[in-house]
Amino acid sequence: MKTFLVFALLAVVATSTIAQMETSCIPGLERPWQEQPLPPQHTLFPQQQPFPQQQQPPFSQQQPSFLQQQPILPQLPFSQQQQPVLPQQSPFSQQQLVLPPQQQYQQVLQQQIPIVQPSVLQQLNPCKVFLQQQCNPVAMPQRLARSQMLQQSSCHVMQQQCCQQLPQIPEQSRYDVIRAITYSIILQEQQQGFVQAQQQQPQQLGQGVSQSQQQSQQQLGQCSFQQPQQQLGQQPQQQQVLQGTFLQPHQIAHLEVMTSIALRTLPTMCSVNVPLYSSTTSVPFSVGTGVGAYL
């Protein structure tokens, strides 16, 4: 028994020594939990700090790039290109003022021709007829043939009626009234010429038609086509007369001649005073319905 116990103790001692030898040879196997992985983790945290340091410089580099893009705002040359366009529009406005010379022509007519009430012109219609019939050969030497064909009795009647009505008009308005009478005579002559021109147009158009068709058209169209032609011819004439801007330069010169002759003839014939200037003040005869009143 003693021997057995001795051998058992020896075996225990041997196993313990063997275990100590093994642990001494492999020291990491004694306490694996005592390993310190913390220092490598601590080393990772300082490695994360350079990352924001690397990210910050690109942001700082992008900011100057934006700042460099912002000064690319030279829009001033565009505004300078728009500004020279405005002075170019001023010559267009100057051309518009130069283009319509008819407006200046109309203003001259309005200044020369007064507007008279129709009732006043009807009152002085005998004076108008007296001038149209050329009762006084000295007044219109170009129309002596027409004046010779008229009876002296009608001229005498027109003269008496004219001399009865002309003194009733205020002296301040006589010049304007006489000028309006001569203007109405020219417009009436222009209207008659316009009607004659329109009546000749259908005759020229019908020259190519056969004689049989012409005879039938004459029989059927004398009652139907002549009247509409006259009506159609009168409507544009009234528009022209109302506008009063269709007088040609030679007609204006003829108007001045007729007015000067009428201003010499009517005052001496009726023994009235007519001032040789247009009345600038407002008179009851200077308010009318338009140039159409002169007909």
UniProtKB/Swiss-Prot annotation:
Residues 30-61 are annotated as: Disordered. Residues 1-20 form the signal peptide. SMART domains: AAI. It comes from the Eukaryota. Keywords: Disulfide bond, Repeat, Seed storage protein, Signal, Storage protein. Gene3D superfamilies: Plant lipid-transfer and hydrophobic proteins. Residues 41-61 have a biased composition (Low complexity). Pfam families: Gliadin. Coiled coil: none annotated. Transmembrane segments: none annotated. One of its GO terms (molecular function) is nutrient reservoir activity. Disulfide-bridge linked aggregates. Belongs to the gliadin/glutenin family. Glutenins are high-molecular weight seed storage proteins of wheat endosperm. Thought to be responsible for the visco-elastic property of wheat dough. This is Glutenin, low molecular weight subunit PTDUCD1. It comes from Triticum aestivum (Wheat). The lineage of its organism: Eukaryota, Viridiplantae, Streptophyta, Embryophyta, Tracheophyta.
